[in-house]
């Protein structure tokens, strides 16, 4: 199957450097301090943030807040038809990646000896799932009013015939394309997460990294608008 047609289009009609539509809804989970439902193309993610609250003794850190992430995916979320419950190897790996990323984003020193829980569930996976979780988590944290260095944005990019393609779908990922998931703060050069899937030739590394950084900047612009609009909508309520 050709990833890019002779006319320069991908299977879903996008150009190689074109991202999918991003739609979000914040504050849906009233039991959480912050929440976000995010659709990135056909990838759908729900994220909820709880805390900060007094941390468990096993998790407690004297001078900062402990970040605990749990990732899961529903049974019919993707092509695998496999339920990724909290605790399987891949889910644990993604959970740790999210923890490390957001430890670099959240101002954890503002909440010593406390704990912040982040739950991410992929309801429907159509590629770039980890990137979508990062983006949903950023908005859920913003909804919760958690102080951060800035909004984190992420993107998954691959290489076809030495040329980058951005925001991969599930069908593109199943072709075992060399790909990188990258996350940055405020769409700038401060990288907080890098995940490499499949072998990538060293000659293509800088190309795909540059494409991923540029895509993170594009995604950040979308997320920043959502966060600003949500803040404006909440301002009258907070004022009362």
Curated annotation (Swiss-Prot):
Task: Output the InterPro entries linked to this UniProt entry.
Answer: ExoRNase_PH_dom1, ExoRNase_PH_dom2, ExoRNase_PH_dom2_sf, PNPase/RNase_PH_dom_sf, Ribosomal_Su5_D2-typ_SF, RNase_PH, RNase_PH_CS
The UniProt entry's GO CC annotations, sorted and at most eight, read:
cytoplasmic exosome (RNase complex); nuclear exosome (RNase complex); nucleolus; nucleoplasm
Residue ranges annotated as transmembrane are: none
Q: Which UniProt keywords apply?
A: Cytoplasm, Exosome, Nucleus, RNA-binding, rRNA processing
Q: What is the annotated localization of this protein?
A: Cytoplasm; Nucleus, Nucleolus; Nucleus; Nucleus, Nucleoplasm
Q: Can you provide one Gene Ontology molecular function annotated for this UniProt record?
A: RNA binding
| SUPFAM superfamilies documented for this protein | Ribonuclease PH domain 2-like (SSF55666), Ribosomal protein S5 domain 2-like (SSF54211)
Read off the CDD domains from this record.
RNase_PH_RRP41 (cd11370)
For the biological process aspect of GO, one term held by this record is: U4 snRNA 3'-end processing
Q: Entry's Gene3D superfamilies?
A: GHMP Kinase, N-terminal domain (3.30.230.70)
Pfam families reported for this sequence: RNase_PH, RNase_PH_C
Q: Member of which family?
A: Belongs to the RNase PH family.
Subunit annotation: Component of the RNA exosome complex.
Give the protein's function: Non-catalytic component of the RNA exosome complex which has 3'->5' exoribonuclease activity and participates in a multitude of cellular RNA processing and degradation events.
Q: What else is known?
A: Exos-4.1 and tin-9.2 are transcribed on a dicistronic transcript where exos-4.1 is the upstream transcript and tin-9.2 the downstream.
Q: What is this protein called?
A: Putative exosome complex component RRP41
